[in-house]
Every structure is written in C-alpha cells, then in structure tokens.
C-alpha cells in the first residue's frame, strides 16, 4: 500500500483546519488536507450553515421566488467553496485528498477514494470533522419519509406549502422565519413552555409576537408521541393529535462528528457526547493530535473554530500564550426577523450567580434610526454589575444587532464600564447611538 509522510495532516476541511493548512503550507511545511465530501470544501459554515442560510434569508427578504432563493444559495456557496479549495490546491506545499480518512493508529490515517488507498503519517494531526445533525428520539423517525435535517432541507424542491418544524432553538426558528417569508405555512413544535427560554423575558414575548405575525404557528409544551406518513405526507403526532405537512424539519441540535473516523484505533479520548476531549491548547489525549471546531465540543460557531486556529497555531509555533482558558464573552446571533444578538448573562442568570445587578431595557420603537428605517420591532437590554459598573451581559434584538453586539464584547473583554457607552460620541442617525441611552442610568 502507498504511504506518505507529512509535517501536518488535517482531517476535515473546516475553518480552523483549512487556515492551519494554509498557514503551515505558506511556511514551507508539507501539509495534507483530507476531505471526504467535495461539496464540503471550506467547512460547515460556508456550505451548509451560516452562509447559505443567511443568503437564503436575504434573498427571501428581497421578494425572490423559492427557486431563485435556492439558486442564489448555490451561487454563493459554490463561489466560496471553489475559493477555499483553490486556496489550498494552488499551494505547492499542500496536498488535498478527496476521500474518506480513518485513523489506523495514533499518527496514521488511511485515506480511501474509490479503489484508491493511501496511508498518511504525520508529525502533527488536526481533527476538524465538525458536527452532524442529531435525529430526535421519536417513535417512527427512522422509517418515516419527508423528514429532513437542516442540511437536507436547503435542497428541498419544490417548495412545501406546509412545513412542520420539530425544535424551537436558533436553527428551527431561523428556518421558520425563512420559510414564512417565502409563503410556506409553518408550524413549530416546542417541548418547552415558551420559545427562546435562555433569553430575556422581553425577547421571548416579542419573538413570539413577531413570529406569529409572520403567520407561524408555535405550539409550546408539546409531547411528541410519534411520526409517520399518511400516503406521501409526513405526520407528526403531538399531544395525541395528528398534524400533516408537505415536509418536516427536525432541528434538535448537532453533535460532534467522531463516528467512522477510526478513533477506536487510537488512544484519543472522547466524552459522553462523543466530543474529543482536549486540553487548553486543543490537544487531545494523544500528544501532537489536536481537535478543533465543533468536534471538540465547544460552542458550535465558525468564529470559535477560527479562535481554535489561533490557539493551535500559537502552540505549534512556540507562541502559545493564548489558550482556551483565556477565551471569554462569546457573542452569538440568531437570525430571526429582526436578528437577535446576545452576549454574557441575562438578568436572571446574573442574579442566580449572586451578582447585585442593575439593568435597563429600551424598545426599538423609541430609537430615531428605527423610524428612519421604518422598522420599529425589537428591544435592547443591558445587565450591569452594580458593585463595579462592569457589563455582565447584553441583548440586542433589532436590525443591525449582529454588528452592534461586537461593541459590547470589546467593552466586556477590556473591563470597560457601561458608562463608557453613555458618554461615547456616535454618528447620527445610527442604531449604535442608542447605546448612549441604553447605558444612561
């Protein structure tokens, strides 16, 4: 069997892995990149998650037809996928293997592409295999048809007239909002007492109101009895009642993708969720083997994968001062209509942790730029430590929230008191200037 040795092997073409491959390739190191699926060059974000779904949301907001939305998705993902492949393929020090990679020992990976096989060995190995959708544990889910995960539904054609969504987390609600924009009648099945249970009460209330205004039916406190088919239609049985749709999306979370990569042939340790256990530099239980991105069980965001790159690159080049224990204040955005951005603690979280807090809420309808935009939906809230005026958390639910939340993060990271925003000079009319009023208390 053919064999080849590399300085660095990357298993999985994700954000952290591809960036490490490009960096070390540019330094003259011999690098191998292994990716099983040519439609995944570049990783989850640009192919099946952040980029395609947000592209679809923007396209739908412009009034494009369903087929046009799908086409725009393909145009954008193809462009970025080809760019990412070219970034490595044109590097003379990087070999890209399109095939299935599986460990056969701690530092050897067998790569299979059809009838072709090769064993690659490496001084350093990076595991960047991402995460996969979790299929819900519901009676009938393994045999019923027309039930889709968040990847599969992005290719669904023709457009369903009715769509059931199992799960009311960020993925489920983003797709609910998207399909409602496109004219599909959407029903969301939520096992909790309300949607967005981790968010501030004002957000839960407003989001429920806005989603309902979009024509979305939200069923809370449901017990999912089973799923089945009535002819060629998928059926959800919940609380003893049957609901029939053209298609059903299950959005019940994602888990680390560590199956079928040969970890049983190594000394690499995984936890109860299947995530690879790592230390503060993302190194696994095998020295020289690192796990980055979703596969190590951290927050499932592409910017966290990029941060893993920073940590591993520093560790491998002798500048490992920044580690996982230094990471803090991770913001996130759920792309509802309007977008919902959060960082840090809610008021309830902060009180439960023993903080004495002071807070302020503002409705977007009171903000000048919102009137210019003719879009008055949403609210801001900030939670402050009353003992030292440092920001504990913030929620921004508005147009532009996905951008503004990063200002809050920088203040939190640098221990800047909330009063800094009260006295800051912002341009006018902007959404950012409302941080003056939000922090004036």
Predicted regions and their residues:
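Beta1/beta-strand and adjacent pyrophosphate-binding region of the FAD-binding site
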Residues: 2-14, 159-169
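Flexible, glycine-rich terminal cap/loop adjacent to redox cofactors
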Residues: 11-39, 44-46, 51, 56, ...
């Amino acid at each position: 069997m053919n064999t080849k040795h590399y300085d660095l092997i990357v298993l999985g073409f994700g954000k952290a892995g591809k960036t490490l491959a490009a960096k070390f390739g540019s330094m003259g190191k011999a690098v191998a990149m292994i990716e099983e699926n040519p439609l995944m060059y570049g990783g989850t974000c640009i192919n099946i998650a952040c980029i395609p779904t947000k592209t679809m949301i923007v396209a739908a907001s412009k009034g494009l037809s369903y087929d046009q939305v799908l086409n725009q998705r393909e145009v954008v993902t193809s462009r970025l996928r080809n760019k990412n492949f070219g970034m490595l393929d044109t590097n003379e020090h990087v070999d890209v293997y399109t095939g299935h990679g599986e460990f056969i020992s701690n530092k050897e990976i067998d790569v299979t592409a059809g009838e072709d096989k090769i064993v690659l060995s490496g001084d350093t190995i990076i595991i960047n295999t991402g995460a996969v959708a979790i299929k819900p544990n519901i009676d009938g889910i393994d045999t019923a048809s027309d039930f889709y995960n968040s990847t599969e539904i992005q290719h669904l054609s023709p457009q369903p007239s009715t769509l059931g969504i199992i799960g009311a987390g960020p993925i489920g609600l983003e797709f609910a909002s998207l399909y409602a924009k496109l004219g599909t009648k959407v029903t969301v099945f939520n096992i909790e007492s309300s949607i967005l249970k981790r968010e501030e009460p004002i957000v839960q209330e407003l989001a429920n109101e806005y989603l309902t205004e979009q024509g979305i039916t939200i069923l809370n406190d449901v017990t999912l009895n089973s799923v089945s088919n009535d002819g060629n239609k998928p059926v959800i049985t919940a609380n003893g009642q049957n609901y029939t749709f053209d298609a059903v999306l299950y959005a019940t979370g994602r888990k680390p993708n560590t199956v079928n990569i040969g970890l049983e042939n190594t000394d690499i340790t995984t936890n109860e969720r299947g995530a690879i256990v790592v230390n503060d530099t993302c190194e696994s239980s095998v020295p020289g083997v690192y796990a980055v991105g979703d596969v190590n069980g951290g927050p499932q965001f592409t910017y966290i994968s990029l941060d893993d790159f920073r940590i591993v690159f520093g560790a491998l080049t002798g500048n490992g001062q920044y580690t996982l224990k230094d990471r803090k204040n991770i913001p996130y955005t759920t792309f509802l209509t309007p977008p919902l951005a959060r960082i840090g603690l809610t008021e309830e979280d902060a009180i439960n942790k023993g903080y004495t807090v002071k807070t302020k809420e503002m409705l977007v309808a009171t903000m000048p730029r919102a009137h210019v935009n003719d879009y008055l939906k949403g609210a801001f809230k900030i939670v402050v430590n009353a003992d030292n005026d440092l920001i504990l958390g913030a929620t921004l639910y508005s147009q532009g929230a996905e951008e503004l939340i990063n200002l809050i993060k920088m203040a939190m990271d640098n221990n800047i008191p909330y009063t800094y925003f009260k006295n800051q000079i912002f341009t006018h009319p902007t959404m950012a200037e409302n941080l003056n009023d939000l922090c004036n208390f």
